[in-house]
């Protein structure tokens, strides 16, 4: 069966998350319904990341197996037409034919996320579902300094959800940077894989550093405590964006991760 890689953009606001669930509309479910409407095929689409309810994506990647071959751009356009007709807040940015060995989840080398904080006194209107509003001033340089305590290979028990199903809490965090442009503070994180709620837990803890409530040493101590109670608040989902997934460029699609 021909396999296709899909690059997907979505507004996570109306969805219970990426993963198909019984308690509401999901991004995966909407995509599978679009495929069913287009081809009559019942498929199971696999995504590179299972974003939570309210989390957005500008570069989620998924793969799907279809019964016949498609010209990729025609598949993209046809799926987008079905998604638009259904009123879905989802767009297929690109479709690409890939070998059977390609797996959107397990072939991934690195995932990139962005967390957006709007730090200003006035409540958000245009950005209401696009960022975390923090009314108090935040010191982004203090946040960045604290973030560097988390970069590297660590046991991130402190920063994962109690409901996380990953076998191991150990991950290698390649990047955690904080920058500012006017009222907007951006936290950018990169790793091969993340634990459930890990980035939102980072964001909540770094907010406390920006408020002067935690020092970089406090953040390091929280990490080393391996205790969920040492974590700051879990930041709300609307500030989180799944930006991009990196894959091998040499065509070697062997599984790089089983997390």
Curated annotation (Swiss-Prot):
Pfam families: PseudoU_synth_1 (PF01416)
Family listed: Belongs to the tRNA pseudouridine synthase TruA family.
Protein name: tRNA pseudouridine synthase A
Single GO biological process annotation from the record: tRNA pseudouridine synthesis
EC number: 5.4.99.12
SUPFAM superfamilies from the UniProt entry: Pseudouridine synthase
Enzyme class: isomerase
Active-site positions on this chain: 52
Lineage: superkingdom: Bacteria
Residues of the signal peptide: none
Organism annotation: Allorhizobium ampelinum (strain ATCC BAA-846 / DSM 112012 / S4) (Agrobacterium vitis (strain S4))
